[in-house]
Amino acid sequence: MQLTGAEIICECLLEQGVDTVFGYPGGAALNTYDALYKYSDKIRHILTAHEQGASHAADGYARATGKTGVVMTTSGPGATNIVTGLATANIDSIPLVAITGNVTTDQLGRDSFQEVDIVDIVKPVTKASFLVEKVEDLADTIRKAFALAQHGRKGPVLVDVPKDVTANKTEFVQLSLIHISEPTRLRCI
């Protein structure tokens, strides 16, 4: 099915069992927030007073539930405001996925309004950070982010998604979730 990048983000969150997202919206993340509103019956958004609070809330949620915490912010100062929360999650091995908006891909590297290279900024305090420049790469990148956050030494992973990537459409193939039942107990006679 054809979906926008923003809808793909929401579908991938559902695939990962995410039911709660913490964040603070802004211009570069509005497409994602519009899609998140359409999914509000399945994914609850907790609006915080500040992005730093959102990152700490996602960390606390992960600690309390055992699930991967998710934080969403916009570009520039919105993205840099979550760095302390990511560092905390990294130091304490807490699984967290941060999804940040950014300026459009044609404006990257041009000192555009509220543009910042958040991918490089967070490298010292995350397990990995990714810039998604094509909508076709978005689903696999989000899935990889969750896998990295949850396996080995747990920790935060950041996915930076430019605004045009969230607006563009591509074919989305949902992962088939395989249910593995509990093994049957056998008795030896």
Language-model region placement:
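Short, hinge-like loop/turn segments at secondary-structure boundaries
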Residues: 38-41, 63-65, 114-117, 148, ...
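Alpha-helix capping and helix-loop boundary segments enriched in small/acidic/polar residues
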Residues: 23, 49, 73-74, 109-116, ...
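Thiamine diphosphate
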Residues: 1-78
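Anionic group-transfer/hydrolysis microenvironments
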Residues: 25, 162, 184
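Short, acidic/small-residue loops that bind anionic groups at enzyme active sites
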Residues: 42-50, 92-109, 124
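Single conserved hydrophobic/aromatic residue that forms the stacking wall/gate
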Residues: 178-189
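Structural signature of the thiamine diphosphate
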Residues: 19-20, 63-74, 79-100, 123-175
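Active-site-proximal loop->helix
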Residues: 35-37, 60, 103-124
